[in-house]
């Protein structure tokens, strides 16, 4: 079989066409970083050695449009300190968030630190979209296994793509308006269904007012006419009318009698 020559671009070994280097965090720590520290052969020669913090991210060897992987050493910022010097010619790398454990809870194989590149001098730098993931071995594991203070780390550098925030906001606003309309229509339907299906209950145990008691008494058929206010009023009015009629009738009778007497006198 013919040996395939490795493809080089700006000093970086490249995979053949159709292949893509996309390892997981655990694979980077176990299969590459640990082997690099112990001197074991690597699965593939695709990760070069370079000092990431000595050059700006856009000047690093490799394709800026894709993810770039490097072996690098950590340089202490102070002689007796543990902080790394992450200043470049145009800016600096700033850590963001907490370090992430790589591996299972019982067996942690490494740590992952996320950094963002800022242009200018701290603390007044301007944030960019360049992101750096720094992988390192656990300190206790490194000291016990290798005996030496090896400062090797594995770095993944990439440019975060910008998203159109205005269009995204507009889409979110449209979705919110549509959701509000749907909820309003659902509420209206629920209210209509409640009105059509909900029975009407009367509370017979509540206290009645005086007016309501009078109305109920008038409308009650079991009450006698003497006790009913409406009937009593009607009977009183009828009695008044009857007395008036009797009075008028008696007056008429008297006039008729007087008329007859006068008539009889004339005949005599």
UniProtKB/Swiss-Prot annotation:
An example Gene Ontology CC term for this record: nucleus
Gene deletion effect: No visible phenotype under normal growth conditions.
DNA-binding annotation, residue ranges on this chain: 109-166
Domain NAC: 15-160
Chief location: nucleus
MF GO annotations: DNA-binding transcription factor activity; transcription cis-regulatory region binding
Pfam families per the UniProt record, alphabetical: NAM (PF02365)
Keywords: Activator, DNA-binding, Nucleus, Transcription, Transcription regulation
Chain segments carrying region Disordered: 166-190
Gene3D superfamilies (UniProt xref): NAC domain
Subcellular location: Nucleus
Biased composition (Basic and acidic residues): 180-190
InterPro entries with a match to the protein in the record: NAC-dom, NAC_dom_sf
Transmembrane segments: none
Function: Transcription activator of the mannan synthase CSLA9. Recognizes and binds to DNA-specific sequence of CSLA9 promoter.
Free-text note on domains in this protein's UniProt record: The NAC domain includes a DNA binding domain and a dimerization domain.
Name of the protein: NAC domain-containing protein 41
Organism: Arabidopsis thaliana (Mouse-ear cress)
Gene designation per UniProt: NAC041
């Amino acid at each position: 079989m013919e040996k395939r020559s490795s493809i080089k671009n700006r000093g970086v070994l490249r995979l053949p066409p159709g292949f893509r280097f996309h390892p997981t965090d655990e694979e980077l720590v176990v299969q590459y970083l640990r082997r690099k520290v112990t001197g074991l052969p690597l699965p593939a020669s695709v990760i070069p050695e370079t000092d990431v913090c000595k050059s700006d991210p856009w000047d690093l060897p490799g394709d800026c449009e894709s993810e770039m992987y490097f072996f690098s050493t950590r340089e202490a910022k102070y002689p007796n300190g543990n902080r790394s010097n992450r200043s470049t010619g145009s800016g600096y790398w700033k850590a963001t968030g907490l370090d992430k454990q790589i591996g299972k809870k019982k067996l942690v194989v490494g740590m992952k630190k996320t950094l963002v590149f800022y242009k200018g001098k701290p603390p007044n730098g301007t944030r960019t979209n360049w992101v750096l993931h720094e992988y390192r071995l656990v300190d206790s594991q490194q000291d016990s296994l290798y005996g030496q203070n090896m400062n090797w780390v594995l770095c993944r550098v990439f440019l975060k793509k910008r998203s159109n925030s205005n269009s995204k906001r507009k889409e979110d606003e449209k979705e919110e308006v549509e959701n509000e309309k749907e909820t309003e229509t659902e509420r209206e339907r629920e209210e209509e269904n409640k009105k059509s299906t909900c029975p009407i209950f009367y509370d017979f145990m509540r206290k009645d007012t005086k007016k309501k008691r009078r109305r109920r008494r008038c409308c009650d058929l079991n009450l006698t006419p003497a006790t009913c206010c409406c009937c009593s009023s009607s009977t009183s009015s009828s009695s008044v009318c009857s007395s008036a009629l009797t009075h008028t009738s008696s007056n008429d009778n008297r006039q008729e009698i007087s008329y007859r007497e006068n008539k009889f006198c004339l005949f005599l």
